[in-house]
């Protein structure tokens, strides 16, 4: 039982010189002393480290977990390159860019499709703004044409093995095969994966210190908030090798259904990010995928100056090639210089020194 003064009885009286004294309330003083004692005890006698569930044997044959060798790295497929070192100390992401291209079936006896000028400019943007140690070009059928001849010396070509299935589920469409192949490249090699219609507008350096980074793709439904996107778009993937998030993403293909478009390439990674938020760094739709593809956004990007890519601070622009082909297929060095619009202003720095001469020769052949 507490003494009377601690139970709200007499207050504490502290005598002072010259017959003065201070009267203090008893209970607060007691609580203060107890709190101080608890704090000092915690500082000088920290709690022991947590023990694993159960109790280790006292047997002399016990091998402590601290003595275990590091686990071996996963078996890397021969068609995926070894991870490169990151660009700077502290970065986690290897200094490499990956493209996956040419998986679309080609009739026997035919060559690959001609690389379009807009794709050449996109790869030039990565070369100029990312300055990677290597640009890996994973392919089944190599492209052809003058723009390919210009960009090819800057690429490391990798003849790939196209996955036909995953976890026993068939991959019938070449786009789904490309989805899986890019994840395999990120798992075993790491770096920055880019779709062929991604224009890099500034360096990614500040994004390379986190194991995995993805960007939101906004929903075309205006009733949904910015934090309720369509998903996380796989047109840009930034990752270290063997990241937990990429492993989860690949494992999710156990439920793959080729009849549901974009389910595992956009919707599923957002679901995984919400379930495991510390495993992936998520950027808003304004980082990579803005302006969007719906409504008049593509038209505004190619016909007006409404959007300023430099002032926006965004890292890249996804050109939505399948929907913007009417604009992209007509690009030329001259049209980019002469026509004032948001897209042309953004891509002008990527025009190469031989583009005008090459375009004239190409045009004569068409």
Curated annotation (Swiss-Prot):
It comes from the Eukaryota. SUPFAM superfamilies: Nucleotide-diphospho-sugar transferases. Residues 1-24 are extracellular. It is found in: Cell membrane. The chain crosses the membrane at residues 25-45. Disruption phenotype: Leads to an absence of beta-1,3-glucan and a strong decrease in alpha-1,4-glucan from the cell wall, a decrease in intracellular glycogen at 37 degrees Celsius, cell wall organization defects, and scattering of glycogen rosettes throughout the cytosol. Decreases survival in macrophage-like cells and leads to a decreased fungal burden in the mouse lung following intranasal inoculation. Simultaneous knockout of GLG1 exacerbates the glycogen synthesis and virulence defect. One of its GO terms (cellular component) is plasma membrane. Keywords: Cell membrane, Cell wall biogenesis/degradation, Glycogen biosynthesis, Membrane, Transmembrane, Transmembrane helix. One of its GO terms (biological process) is fungal-type cell wall organization. InterPro entries: GlycoTrfase_DXD_sugar-bd_CS, Nucleotide-diphossugar_trans. Coiled coil: none annotated. Gene3D superfamilies: 3.90.550.20. It is a single-pass membrane protein. Residues 46-366 are cytoplasmic. Belongs to the glycosyltransferase 32 family. Plays a role in the localization of glycogen rosettes to the plasma membrane. Required for correct cell wall organization and may facilitate the connection between beta-1,3-glucan and beta-1,6-glucan in the cell wall. This is Glucan organizing enzyme 1. It comes from Cryptococcus neoformans var. grubii serotype A (strain H99 / ATCC 208821 / CBS 10515 / FGSC 9487) (Filobasidiella neoformans var. grubii). The lineage of its organism: Eukaryota, Fungi, Dikarya, Basidiomycota, Agaricomycotina. The gene is GOE1.
């Amino acid at each position: 039982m507490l003494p009377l003064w601690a139970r709200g009885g007499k207050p504490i009286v502290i005598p002072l010189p010259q017959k003065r004294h201070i009267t203090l309330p008893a209970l607060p003083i007691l609580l203060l002393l107890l709190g101080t004692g608890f704090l000092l005890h915690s500082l000088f006698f920290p709690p022991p480290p947590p023990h694993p569930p159960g109790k280790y044997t006292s047997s002399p044959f016990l091998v402590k977990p601290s003595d275990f060798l590091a686990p071996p790295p996963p078996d890397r497929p021969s068609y995926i390159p070894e991870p490169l070192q990151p660009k700077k100390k502290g970065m986690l992401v290897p200094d490499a860019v990956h493209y996956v291209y040419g998986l679309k079936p080609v009739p026997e006896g035919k060559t690959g499709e001609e690389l379009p000028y807009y794709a050449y400019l996109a790869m030039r943007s990565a070369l100029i703004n990312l300055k990677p140690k290597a640009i890996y070009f994973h392919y089944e059928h190599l492209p052809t044409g003058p723009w390919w001849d210009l960009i090819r010396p800057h690429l490391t070509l990798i003849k790939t093995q196209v996955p036909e299935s995953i976890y026993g589920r068939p991959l019938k469409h070449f786009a789904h095969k490309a989805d899986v192949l890019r994840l395999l490249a990120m798992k075993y090699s790491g770096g920055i994966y880019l779709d062929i219609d991604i224009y890099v507008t500034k360096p990614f350096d500040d994004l390379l210190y986190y194991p995995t980074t993805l960007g939101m793709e906004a929903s075309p439904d205006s009733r949904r908030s910015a934090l309720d996107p369509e998903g996380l778009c796989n047109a840009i993937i930034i990752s270290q090798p063997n990241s937990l998030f990429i492993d989860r993403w690949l494992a999710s293909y156990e439920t793959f259904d080729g009849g549901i478009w974009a389910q595992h390439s956009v919707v599923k990674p957002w679901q995984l990010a919400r379930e495991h938020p510390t495993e992936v760094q998520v950027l808003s739709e304004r980082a990579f995928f803005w302006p969007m593809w719906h409504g008049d956004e593509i038209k505004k990007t190619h016909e007006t100056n409404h959007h300023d890519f430099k002032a926006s601070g965004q890292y890249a622009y996804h050109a939505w090639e399948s929907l913007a082909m009417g604009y992209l297929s007509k690009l030329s060095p001259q049209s980019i210089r002469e026509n004032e619009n948001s897209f042309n202003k953004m891509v002008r720095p990527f025009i190469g020194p031989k583009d005008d001469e090459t375009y004239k020769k190409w045009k004569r052949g068409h």
